[in-house]
């Protein structure tokens, strides 16, 4: 982004940090409300799937921006990042359902560490398959940075595939359905 999409590294770094700030503000505003709605209405899994799809969509969209398409790239980044952060909120909400109270920290730590291992494996695959080869695989163009942009599609697919076990096998515990007006109070 800072070297190809933005006009220079200084402007690119400034704009990227603004994208992160916008993400943080959106997540800070959405998390309490969405969390209360999901907890009180019994929709944690639905929202986990929804926000994960938003994250995957944002990652996929990052393939398309060309040099100087700063706004498009930032919007795609913010979409993906908000999706990831909001998905994390709902993923964390499942911890009491899947781990005994005294093991929640350990299970959470394992989850994060497996996530980082998966991210490192995806990074290595991206480097080996797309970025480092002299002649990129899949006939991707180095001139238009397609070989680098394609890593976003790979990450979107990677994330989608490795989210499936969670979607299929993690069960949501019982929730207390909200009385009218309690969602606002709870948020």
Where are these regions (language model features)?
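Membrane-embedded alpha-helical bundles of multi-pass transporters/translocases
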Residues: 1-171, 177-178, 184-187
